[in-house]
Amino acid sequence: MWIQVRTIDGSQTRTIEDVSRKATIEELRERVWALFDVRPECQRLFYRGKQLENGYTLFDYDVGLNDIIQLLVRPDSSLPSTSKQNDAQVKPSSHNPPKVKKTARGGSSSQPSTSARTCLIDPGFGLYKVNELVDARDVGLGAWFEAHIHSVTRASDGHSRGKTPLKNGSSYKRTNGNVNHNSKENTNKLDNVPSTSNSDSVAADEDVIYHIEYDEYPESGILEMNVKDLRPRARTILKWNELNVGDVVMVNYNVENPGKRGFWYDAEITTLKTISRTKKEVRVKVFLGGSEGTLNDCRVMSVDEIFKIEKPGAHPISFADGKFLRKNDPECDLCGGDPDKTCHMCSCHKCGEKRDPNMQLLCDECNMAYHIYCLSPPLDKVPEEEYWYCPSCKTDSSEVVKAGERLKLSKKKAKMPSASTESRRDWGRGMACVGRTKECTIVPSNHYGPIPGIPVGSTWRFRVQVSEAGVHRPHVGGIHGRSNDGAYSLVLAGGFEDEVDRGDEFTYTGSGGKNLAGNKRIGAPSADQTLTNMNRALALNCDAPLDDKIGAESRNWRAGKPVRVIRSFKGRKISKYAPEEGNRYDGIYKVVKYWPEISSSHGFLVWRYLLRRDDVEPAPWTSEGIERSRRLCLRLQYPAGYPSEKEGKKTKGQSKKQGSEATKRPASDDECPGDSKVLKASDSTDAVEAFQLTPQQQRLIREDCQNQKLWDEVLASLVEGPNFLKKLEQSFMCVCCQELVYQPVTTECFHNVCKDCLQRSFKAQVFSCPACRHDLGQNYVMVLNETLQTLLDLFFPGYSKGR
């Protein structure tokens, strides 16, 4: 096994070869010292967010093949002297205020009573009086909200005329039903001297700053407003016979969802239509204010709530005359904002009661509110911590492994045979223990027949690569199958000396009969084999009734289930058809017959199988197969990150061995041509054999007009041979599931998405294309592209079976 070590800045990367998964972190530090010239005490090693500590192995941290470990070089001056310095944590400041839930319409104990705000106070200047009810325009939304004058001051030199800055330079943002604002309350003293109206001082009012407070959003605090964003509170509802086309009125409209109640905007009436005695329609042009412009042809949902816009100088009103509050979009769609109705979404998530808002805590993760006395266990007071998480979102600190701490015990690893064995054998160096780095998903694991894109003659250096390609899934097992279905693939590795291999036909010995207790991979035969498990699975591939006594012979051997056969270099000792290095895919075989017999090598009963080749592709040891492998540029495939020096040494050693064998004996006539030579990239001088399309595939590609641009790009890679299928898979990959698209829906923006994936997107109220975010609309009809589905089934037979 090999791993990579990279500096934290990414400037240097080194490969550590021949490392065991059982290697300790101390041994790894020594290897890093030799490569980076960094002493072990100056190293901080990280893998997947964890700091590697001494006393553990790479297996404890699940370090796999070709994984990257990051190296942080610790300066000598900052070497920790005690463990406390390593575990020092930056504590959050305790003076930060706790997060307490505030209700939008709930009153605060610090607010003055309504009776104290009923008296209008004339400050002696300005158009509006203190405590006067007004409508204030949100400069960001252009909507009008109910407010009252808190105080009136003269504009200083620091204020810009014509603008509406917020107090202390703070900013605020309001969405439908919510206000987010940070500001301090105004502390100016009011001159409690009543005076008369001052409505004729409009010209001098531009130098006056009005400090207002929203009636329904007291948590926004005191805001500074200019006179152009204020007007007297709307109080008159216009009747149907009072409405005229061209009038500018105030209507309720939801910009994001026109079918629901929203905010209040100025609008010009464009259409008045009487549909029936009780049903009327009003269409307006909504003024959003600022740079937002207008919205044309907007239908008003509440035709019986159209307000007259009051002009400056209108009769002033206060809370003594009434609240004059209009209906806005409810803060909660579940309860409609009803203060008397329990709701677990907008109030306490535990009890649902809308009481004691000052005793509610907001979770910093899910944003749900909880009463401190509804928690388990209940809290006596609001905590002083800056961040608080509810019981559902809180991470158990005992499960978090901090830097410098020891790993938590894994129940899964404690049950492994390697955890209880007393053997000192270093099993961590084997490639069978590294695990897959990727998985074949183009076809399901129970797929019969060839794997799309894997031609006969493909060779891999290690068995784990064969598993990643999907040709033979097990890392170690010789047969892959299911006892109630059949066998899908097998590896011919020469495990029994009395097996016979004739190339197109060979005998295969079943599995079992060996003592593999503990963590053993091989063992001497110690019992008779039985026709169960994988032996039974392989027997089911024979076109004959199952017989676990004397076996059976197929009635028509070509009618049996196909088996993918991989020949391993280990079988070279008994077969000249095996490759000299690696594991080679030799095509499809069928089971001709199976029978029990006593093995001549160890004397126990074994089950034998006779398999015969049934593949249209030529065998890799024939002259046609060698030529085809050369045309397809098939060569020995190494894993990603495999050391090039090791590859060069192996190639050099093989050439010497082949030369010595050539001088010892001449090649016999019955020896297979080419002797399963593995081609290198330098051996290929001709162009790669182009991928051939069938007439049916060509016709269907012409019919798929929606994806013509994609097909033009894909067909350009036909000259690359087997790589054509890889290009095809990448081009028609679903952006949602990252798999080859299944039951494709070609959108109007010419992107292909799985129908199930698009339905899940629509179910989540996302009505746009997952690839480009083009708006498809809520009523979009998903039409299955059957032509594309047929094409993909032809190029990748069996891929839709497991979807």
UniProtKB/Swiss-Prot annotation:
Residues 79-96, 106-115, 167-181, 189-200 have a biased composition (Polar residues). Keywords: Cell cycle, Chromosome, Disulfide bond, DNA-binding, Metal-binding, Nucleus, Phosphoprotein, Transferase, Ubl conjugation, Ubl conjugation pathway, Zinc, Zinc-finger. PANTHER family: E3 UBIQUITIN-PROTEIN LIGASE UHRF-RELATED (PTHR14140), E3 UBIQUITIN-PROTEIN LIGASE UHRF2 (PTHR14140:SF3). A zinc finger (RING-type) spans 734-773. E3 ubiquitin ligase that plays important roles in DNA methylation, histone modifications, cell cycle and DNA repair. Acts as a specific reader for 5-hydroxymethylcytosine (5hmC) and thereby recruits various substrates to these sites to ubiquitinate them. This activity also allows the maintenance of 5mC levels at specific genomic loci and regulates neuron-related gene expression. Participates in cell cycle regulation by ubiquitinating cyclins CCND1 and CCNE1 and thus inducing G1 arrest. Also ubiquitinates PCNP leading to its degradation by the proteasome. Disruption phenotype: Deletion mice are viable, fertile, and grossly normal. However, adult mice develop frequent spontaneous seizures and display abnormal electrical activities in brain. In addition, they display reduced 5-hydroxymethylcytosine (5hmC) in genomic DNA in the brain together with impaired spatial memory acquisition and retention. One of its GO terms (biological process) is cell differentiation. Residues 449-613 form the YDG domain. This is E3 ubiquitin-protein ligase UHRF2. GO terms for cellular component: heterochromatin; nucleoplasm; nucleus; pericentric heterochromatin. Homodimer; disulfide-linked. Binds methylated CpG containing oligonucleotides. Interacts with H3; the interaction has a preference for the 'Lys-9' trimethylated form of H3 (H3K9me3). Interacts with PCNP. Interacts with HDAC1. Interacts directly with CCNE1; the interaction ubiquitinates CCNE1 and appears independent of CCNE1 phosphorylation. Interacts with CCND1; the interaction ubiquitinates CCND1 and appears independent of CCND1 phosphorylation. Interacts with p53/TP53 and RB1. Interacts with UBE2I. Interacts with ZNF618. Interacts with UHRF1. Interacts with FANCD2. Interacts with ATR. E3 ligase activity is robustly activated by 5-hydroxy-methylcytosine. It comes from Mus musculus. It is found in: Nucleus; Chromosome. May be autoubiquitinated; which may lead to proteasomal degradation. Phosphorylated. Phosphorylation may be mediated by CDK2. The gene is Uhrf2. Residues 415-645 are annotated as: Methyl-CpG binding and interaction with HDAC1. Induction: Up-regulated during cell differentiation. It is an enzyme of class 2 (transferase). The modification Phosphoserine is found at residue 668. InterPro entries: PHD_UHRF2, PUA-like_sf, RING-HC_UHRF2, SRA-YDG_sf, SRA_YDG, TTD_dom, Tudor_UHRF2_rpt1, Ubiquitin-like_dom. Residues 1-78 form the Ubiquitin-like domain. It catalyses: S-ubiquitinyl-[E2 ubiquitin-conjugating enzyme]-L-cysteine + [acceptor protein]-L-lysine = [E2 ubiquitin-conjugating enzyme]-L-cysteine + N(6)-ubiquitinyl-[acceptor protein]-L-lysine.
